[in-house]
Amino acid sequence: MAMTIRDIAREAGVSTATVSRALRGLPNVDPVTRERVRQVAERLDYVVSPAASRLASGRAGSIAVITPYIARWYFGRVLSGIEKVLQGSDLDLLLSSIGDPSETHHVPPHRKLRRRVDGFLVISLSTDTEGVNEIFEADVPVALIDTERDGCWSVGIDDRDGARMAVQHLVNLGHERVGLISGRVMPTPFRPEESRWQGYRDTLVEAGLPVEDDLEACGHFTIEGGERAMTTLLARPNPPTAVFAMSDEMAFGALRSLRAHGLQPGRDLSVVGFDGHEMSEFLDLTTIVQPVEEVGARAAQALLDAIDDPTRKPEQVVLPLDMVVRGSTALRRPH
């Protein structure tokens, strides 16, 4: 027969309330009493019921992650970092994918979700996005990835600075017509994309180089989209000699398009990606490397800290970027 809290209390000579507090690690329990209760529970092979513990603590025992996508590389890696941290906690993960917020058919998180979780993690979505803004009405902590809001923890990178690093690298190589493969037409509800677009344009302006709509094409953050976008840029009357792709996957597609047109990446047209995808090394792609899994892990830990101590002042964490130069970029060839 399974042991109960009453059995522990009778054996340890304390009340059931004291046993409950001692086993849950709550304050106002004498250390000697806490240790005696722990030893009795261990001797009687007592197992704490997670459901009962959550009920007693007033917690739901889970957190919700709100993300636009699940299957795409970046979001999958962020989720991997989140899961690694949660494995060391007693919280479950509820995943809600709302789809592309720029499209009218996306599905917002159900309002009932607010009553089933102890906190929210929001990935890459503007806090004004429909279905996201409502979570701030819930009286639970919220941590943000790739965006910020007053009163919330946030973890991310400087996307504008990353784009500037990429474009400045191309400018330093002598390229005067630098193209862009973005995810979608601006403006966009994705803050990282908006920031990278601004960094791209700012760098060109500072270098005295042309900023033209004809130098930009949308790749929808897919390999196929990147290939189509590069093909579009190559067909322009005055095509670029270098291209910055907002993601490595779009850059992979751009490289495929170059080869299909008999062009050699680097020698004939330079390409820089953004992410640090594992395949970038095999494809010899110059890229801006971001610590994707660490972003997810740091955000998850921040949320756990906020759940444990709601009085903690939220922090905005910006993680560093790096650029790895490979064969897809080279000095501009004279005409």
Please name every model-derived segment.
Residues M3, S62-Q168, N172, H335:
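Alpha-helical recognition/docking segments in bacterial nutrient-uptake
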Residues T16-S20, L55-A71, H169, R177-M186:
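Short beta-strand segments enriched in small/hydrophobic residues
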Residues M3, R24, N28-V32, P50, ...:
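Residues at secondary-structure transition points
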Residues R43, K84-S89, E137-L144, E148-H335:
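Bacterial carbohydrate/catabolite-sensing allosteric modules
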Residues M1-G61, R333-H335:
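N-terminal helix-turn-helix DNA-binding module of bacterial transcription factors
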